[in-house]
């Protein structure tokens, strides 16, 4: 009998693992979804109202903005529309478009230094390992994003996770541990992606000052949506001066691709020399960088849309509460917590049957027993769209 090849044995073992995931109702699949104008999406031949996108400000799905952007470049062959930088930034991939975008970001955030990354994941797996080493401690909110958790694991520093938004637990850890470490980093999201709740950054800033810590805030779900000119929750709460490193993304409310961080010039220069996901990757293409610069300037003036988005969020959350449903948060992310995995899947199907595109979020993305539907609202949704979602 012929011995199976290593490749076929691997395939069989992985297939068995996938079969178990499917039996548990947790098999993940890639869905082909076409994004239409506004908050519409097409899936499997049907048009849906999209409540699952991170296009919070409706910018990514706005064809008029795309036309305005491309009208700035009459020559389609312009190097400003190039689809590749063809190099890492430390070689020849640091294009004029990249420098302009970083200048725009720096000006938006009070003339601090800015640096652009290929994604938020790149930023979060690179910043902490570059800055935090042996003899340092990282204290991270327990519900921080997986990319932050991966960054903790890659860093040579010790790390502890404090209970979600439990600042007394954070203080207890600092009181116990601070004296034994050179540097201590406090890392939190501002708006949390699964619960839609917000960190009390004013209180965290006071703790940071009391214990001489370094504060890193991931504003992925707040930039574009919160704060003056969409600069985030730290600016809204008046604590930008206390944030040592602010991480933002272009891939959500700002309708583009990539990420950025705001910091002091010395920190930026250190990252350029030590941050591996920045050093060892091809830079973003000029067309994306120019689009990000264009959209960043547009979004800064969209205070009316930001107010509308918060109004829609309060409307949906309030309607759920009026019906006795379990929800929470204080942002454009509105969770509807169901509990059991299959019940969440069944409810998601019910919404799909009524033209609402929203999916079940299950473990391990959320804790066991807290499967939910995660409604990501967009300023492009209508009142009728939200009323329909609230009534099903």
Role assignments for model-derived ranges:
Residues 307-314, 321-355, 369-370, 377-379:
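Conserved PLP-binding catalytic core of the aspartate aminotransferase-like
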Residues 1, 61-63, 67, 71, ...:
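PLP-dependent enzyme catalytic core of the Aspartate aminotransferase-like
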Residues 127-146:
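Conserved PLP-anchoring active-site segment centered on the Schiff-base-forming lysine
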Residues 229, 235-270:
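Active-site PLP attachment segment
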Residues 283-302, 308, 312, 322:
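Structural motif of enzymes handling amino- and sulfur-group chemistry
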Residues 160, 164-217:
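Active-site phosphate-binding strand-loop segment of PLP-dependent enzymes
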């Amino acid at each position: 009998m012929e011995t199976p090849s290593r490749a076929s044995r691997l395939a069989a073992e992985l297939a068995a693992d996938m079969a178990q995931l499917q039996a548990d109702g947790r098999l993940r699949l890639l869905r082909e979804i076409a994004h239409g104008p506004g908050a519409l999406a097409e899936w499997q031949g049907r048009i849906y109202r999209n409540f699952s996108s991170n296009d919070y400000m409706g910018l990514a799905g706005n064809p008029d903005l795309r036309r305005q952007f491309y009208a700035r470049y009459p020559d389609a062959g312009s190097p400003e529309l190039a689809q590749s930088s063809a190099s890492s930034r430390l070689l020849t991939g640091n294009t004029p478009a990249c420098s302009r975008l970083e200048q725009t970001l720096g000006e938006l955030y009070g003339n601090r230094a800015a640096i652009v990354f290929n994604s938020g994941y790149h930023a979060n797996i690179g910043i902490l390992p570059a800055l935090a080493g042996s003899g340092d401690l990282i204290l991270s909110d327990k519900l921080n994003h997986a990319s932050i958790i991966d960054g903790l694991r890659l860093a040579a520093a010790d790390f502890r996770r404090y209970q979600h938004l439990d600042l007394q637990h954070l203080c207890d850890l600092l009181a116990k541990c601070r004296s034994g470490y050179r540097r201590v980093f406090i890392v939190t999201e501002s708006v949390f992606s699964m619960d839609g709740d917000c960190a009390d950054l004013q209180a965290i800033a006071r703790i940071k000052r009391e214990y001489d810590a370094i504060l890193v805030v991931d504003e992925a779900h707040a930039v574009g949506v919160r704060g003056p000119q969409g600069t985030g929750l730290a600016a809204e709460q008046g604590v930008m001066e206390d944030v040592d490193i602010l991480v933002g993304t272009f891939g959500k409310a700002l309708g583009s691709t990539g990420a950025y961080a705001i910091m002091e010039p010395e920190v930026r220069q250190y990252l350029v020399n030590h941050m591996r996901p920045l050093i060892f990757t091809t830079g973003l293409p000029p067309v994306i960088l120019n689009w990000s610069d264009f959209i960043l300037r547009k979004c800064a003036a969209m205070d009316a849309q930001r107010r509308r988005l918060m109004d829609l969020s309060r409307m949906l959350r309030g309607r759920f509460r009026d019906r006795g449903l379990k929800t929470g948060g204080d942002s454009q992310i509105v969770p509807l917590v169901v509990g059991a995995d299959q019940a969440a899947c069944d409810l998601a199907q019910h919404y799909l049957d009524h033209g609402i595109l929203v999916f079940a979020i299950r473990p391990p993305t959320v804790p066991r027993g807290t499967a939910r539907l995660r409604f990501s609202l967009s300023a492009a949704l209508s009142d009728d769209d939200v009323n329909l979602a609230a009534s099903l």
